A protein has these predicted regions:
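Low-complexity intrinsically disordered segments
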Residues: 52, 57-188
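N-terminal domain-onset segments
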Residues: 1-54
Length: 188
């Protein structure tokens, strides 16, 4: 995956600059042109909307490689049965992490960093957790490969127009950036 290091650098820069990273997706087409969408996710409905916009944008722009990165909570796996019902954000042994995940038709990769903060919530350091990279890379919930541009399967113009229409009512929830974004903000 050609752009993994570039996206990893961007994710680390964002958390150092802003202190947090919203759910972000970056897609690349066959010519290496990129587009990026992100939003603050508050609930499951937001996740669904983000997933739909991500899928549509990958399809419309024939993405052949994509990356997702975000900060969140990871819990220890040695919890007993009663603790399993606790949401990760409420688990006292939770760890804040920055996850960067990428996928192309042939490969997938992930990098996990434990986020270390001081009492004032300022970022102190990002500790690479190489022991978790493979587990995250193989997590089926992370995969969106069906949305990538498949060289054997081309989306028709009709498919793309249908997806553009589905994305049109959601302009207010996504922020688009880039000097020349592939995506037209009016459609998203």
């Amino acid at each position: 995956m050609k752009h993994f290091k570039q996206v990893l650098t961007e994710a680390r820069r964002m958390i150092r600059q802003d202190g947090d990273v919203s759910l972000t997706a970056v897609g690349f087409d066959a010519n290496g042109r990129a587009f990026k969408i992100w939003m603050q996710v508050e609930n499951d409905k937001d996740k669904e909307r983000f997933g739909m916009a991500m899928a549509g944008n990958f399809m419309v722009h024939s993405a052949i490689e994509y990356y997702v990165f975000f900060t969140g909570w990871m819990v220890t796996l040695d919890r007993d049965e009663t603790e399993l019902k606790t949401r990760p954000s409420k688990d006292p042994r939770r760890r804040e992490v920055l996850i960067v995940y990428g996928e192309s038709p042939d490969e997938k990769a992930a990098q996990v960093y434990e986020v270390v903060r001081d009492a004032g919530e300022r970022l102190l350091e990002l500790k690479a957790r190489d022991d978790l990279d493979e587990m995250v890379a193989n997590n089926s919930q992370m995969r969106f490969a069906g949305m990538l541009g498949d060289t054997k399967r081309k989306h028709t113009q009709e498919d793309r127009e249908r997806m553009r229409k589905m994305l049109k009512p959601m302009p207010e929830i996504f922020r688009i950036y880039g000097p020349e974004p592939l995506i037209n903000p009016a459609l998203n």
